[in-house]
Amino acid sequence: MKRTYQPNKRKRQKVHGFRKRMSTKNGRRVLASRRRKGRKVISA
């Protein structure tokens, strides 16, 4: 059986990237909560 995580930079950005987060209201909420928490990295 192959492993479930098959790294792919492009897909990672397309699904979890900053621009993807900014493109929806809930995505912006995610960024806001991560900023509020003080995360060093706010998106992939």
From Swiss-Prot:
Extent of the signal sequence: none
GO cellular component terms listed in the entry, alphabetical order: ribonucleoprotein complex; ribosome
Keyword Ribosomal protein annotated: yes
UniProt KW keywords: Ribonucleoprotein, Ribosomal protein
Gene Ontology MF: a single term: structural constituent of ribosome
Domain of life: Bacteria
One GO term (biological process): translation
Ranges for region Disordered: 1-44
Family: Belongs to the bacterial ribosomal protein bL34 family.
Protein name listed in UniProt: Large ribosomal subunit protein bL34
The organism of origin for this protein: Enterococcus faecalis (strain ATCC 700802 / V583)
